[in-house]
């Protein structure tokens, strides 16, 4: 009897551990899907029109061109994509953002570009995590009608590399966004 009880409890514990582990590793289907396209390590498809990644290399730009990406929105503060994209048909856009001091106005201006360029579009910064994550979270709220909570959850937990210990300012900015005001400024509310 004691042996059976021990076996039963052991089985029960293993079952609970397995279930809790598998539930914690399930990625919501609405979150961006990782794309395996060398040389990228942080390339995701947000929706049929928008992708996100780290800084593309020259090889990366060619791969994006072959994938059918039409436009690139760089959020890099210093570097441009001109040299890397030289031998492609990609349309290059740049909106320079400093990660430490990103403002609501910069988010809206970046979204305005993203909404109006030829699609599909890739949004990137250096690592594809902080500035890119902020703009994609705002895109989720303004264009895809996500709740603020869901957009921030994906931003923080999506595996894109958000540096929360350094850039809490981005979380504060996203928390303060008035979604209806942002939609109105972008012409998304009639």
Predicted features by range, described:
Residues 8-20:
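Bacterial N-terminal signal peptides
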Residues 20-121, 134-190:
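Cys-dependent protein tyrosine phosphatase-like superfamily
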Residues 128:
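Substrate/cofactor-recognition hotspot
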């Amino acid at each position: 009897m004691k042996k059976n009880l021990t076996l039963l409890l052991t089985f029960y514990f293993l079952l609970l551990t397995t279930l809790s582990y598998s539930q914690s590793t399930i990625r919501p289907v609405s979150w961006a899907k990782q794309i395996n396209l060398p040389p990228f390590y942080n390339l995701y498809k947000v929706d049929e029109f928008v992708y996100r990644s780290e800084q593309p290399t020259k090889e990366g730009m060619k791969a994006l061109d072959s994938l059918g990406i039409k436009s690139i929105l760089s959020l890099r503060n210093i570097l441009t994509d001109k040299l890397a994209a030289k031998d492609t048909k990609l349309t290059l856009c740049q909106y320079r953002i400093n990660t430490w001091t990103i403002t609501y106005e910069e988010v809206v201006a970046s979204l305005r570009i993203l909404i109006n360029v030829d699609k599909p579009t890739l949004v990137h910064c250096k690592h594809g995590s902080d500035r890119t994550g902020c703009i994609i979270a705002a895109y989720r709220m303004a264009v895809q009608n996500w709740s603020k909570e869901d957009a921030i959850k994906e931003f923080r937990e999506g595996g894109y590399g958000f540096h929360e210990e350094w850039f809490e300012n981005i979380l504060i900015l996203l928390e303060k966004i008035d979604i209806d005001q942002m939609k109105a400024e972008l012409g998304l509310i009639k």
